């Protein structure tokens, strides 16, 4: 049976960046992989960022956004059926940052998918500098994704390092600085889990805290075998469109400096929420 890994994580946590590294490891190991991208918005930006991975060992597929839940579920299943005929060794699914993890497991139990696929690892990407102030809906998404994770991978630790030696030195310093922040994030996650009536408690052993530029074969092998943790929790009913929105800047000729200035003005403008 083909194993499917689910890579979850809140909006902007770093899922696509992680998938690039994970996919490269799998291809270097001789595996043929498929990557299924699903974006909440109508334009799949993440797929654009992965285009250069396409080749003999890697194919990209996408589920278009902007549809109702039932249509999305049907498209998800149809895409997995077609991918099941391509002879992949492993499939990576990157859902949107506001994905219901139960949908993944429910679909894999439907025919004919239950004869072709089995869940691999559920890997949840969490920003090591996660905001402390989050809405009820944001905390719910964070907790629901962490609840089923076989491994939680912290992102944005020791970024933009130049050499392996420098990476190792700065990684230690970065991890030392991040320990307090990560402890706070773990506490935040566990509080969010309690709020949705989930009995799971995330511990350090459930996490990978490391600069991604220094990830080893052993790290990736551990992630491949991380599996998942089936947990029960209380669902929060809310409409995605009423809580989260997508903004697009397509073919807009603007300098980096002007873009930064515009972004700062948006965040400082109370009318933007």
Please describe what each predicted stretch is.
Residues 2-135:
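Nucleotide-state-sensitive switch-loop elements of NTP-binding domains
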Residues 16-20, 139, 179, 260-263:
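Short amphipathic alpha-helical segment that frequently serves as the phosphate-/nucleotide-binding helix
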Residues 23, 80, 94, 143, ...:
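Short amphipathic alpha-helical segments and helix-helix/interface helices
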Residues 48, 139-142, 233-237:
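Short beta-strand/turn micro-motifs at beta-sheet edges
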Residues 98, 139, 249-253:
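Conserved phosphate/pyrophosphate-binding and hydrolysis machinery centered on Walker-type P-loop NTPases
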Residues 109-117, 142-146, 179:
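A short alpha->loop->secondary-structure connector
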Residues 132, 136-148:
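Flexible active-site lid/hinge loop adjacent to a nucleotide/diphosphate
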Residues 148-273:
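C-terminal accessory "lid"/substrate-recognition subdomains
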């Amino acid at each position: 049976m083909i194993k499917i890994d689910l890579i979850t994580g809140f909006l902007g946590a770093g899922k696509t960046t992680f998938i690039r590294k994970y996919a490269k490891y799998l291809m270097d190991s001789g595996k043929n992989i498929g990557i299924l991208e699903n974006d909440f918005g109508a334009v799949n930006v993440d797929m654009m960022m992965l285009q250069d991975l396409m080749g003999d060992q890697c194919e990209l597929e996408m589920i278009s956004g902007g549809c109702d839940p039932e249509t999305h579920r049907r498209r998800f299943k149809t895409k997995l059926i077609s991918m099941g005929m391509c002879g992949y060794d492993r499939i990576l699914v990157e859902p949107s940052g506001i994905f219901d993890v139960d949908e993944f497991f429910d679909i894999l139990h439907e025919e004919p998918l239950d004869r072709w696929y089995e869940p691999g690892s559920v890997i949840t990407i969490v920003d090591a500098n996660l905001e402390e102030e989050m809405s009820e809906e944001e905390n719910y998404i964070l907790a629901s994704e962490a609840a089923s994770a076989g491994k939680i991978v912290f992102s944005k630790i020791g970024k933009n390092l130049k050499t392996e030696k420098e990476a190792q030195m700065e990684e230690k310093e970065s991890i030392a600085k991040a320990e307090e922040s990560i402890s706070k994030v773990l506490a935040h996650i566990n509080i969010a889990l309690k709020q949705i009536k989930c009995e799971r408690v995330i511990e350090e052993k459930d996490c990978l805290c490391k600069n991604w530029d220094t990830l080893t074969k052993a790290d990736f092998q551990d992630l491949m075998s991380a599996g998942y943790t089936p947990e029960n929790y209380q669902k929060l009913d809310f409409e995605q469109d009423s809580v989260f929105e997508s903004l697009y800047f397509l073919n807009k000729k603007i300098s980096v400096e002007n873009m930064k200035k515009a972004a700062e003005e948006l965040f400082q403008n109370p009318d933007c929420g």
